[in-house]
């Protein structure tokens, strides 16, 4: 299960493999996102609560990972 502070490994778009600490979850589509119980949620202005990110918007979610060489960014698809 993904949690902030966990060690994660991912492969970027050119095939380089990185490992590091998951530090933040971000989104191009939503202003306020969080990681809870391994699921990304966003603040819904309509319902006034956090709700899971819809499947069609999963591509807008990415994660900040602190590696030994600096900060890297990865999507769900790049984790292994």
Where are the model-predicted features located?
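Residue-level detector of beta-strand structural context in well-folded domains
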Residues: 6-8, 31, 63
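Intrinsically disordered, low-complexity, charged/polar segments
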Residues: 40-80
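Short coil-to-beta transition motif at edge beta-strands of beta-rich domains
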Residues: 1-13, 21
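Short, solvent-exposed secondary-structure boundary/capping segments
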Residues: 29-39
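Acidic/polar residues in short coil/turn loops that connect beta-strands
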Residues: 12-14, 37, 69
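Short beta-strand-centered aromatic/proline hotspots
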Residues: 16-28
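Short coil/loop residues immediately preceding or within conserved phosphate-binding loops
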Residues: 5, 17, 60
């Amino acid at each position: 299960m993904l949690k902030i502070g966990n060690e994660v490994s991912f492969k970027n778009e050119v095939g380089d493999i990185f490992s590091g600490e998951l530090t933040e979850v971000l989104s191009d589509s939503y202003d306020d996102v969080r990681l809870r119980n391994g699921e990304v949620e966003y603040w819904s202005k309509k319902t006034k609560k956090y709700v899971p990110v819809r499947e069609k918007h999963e591509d807008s979610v990415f994660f900040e990972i602190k590696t030994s060489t600096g900060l890297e960014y990865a999507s769900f698809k790049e984790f292994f």
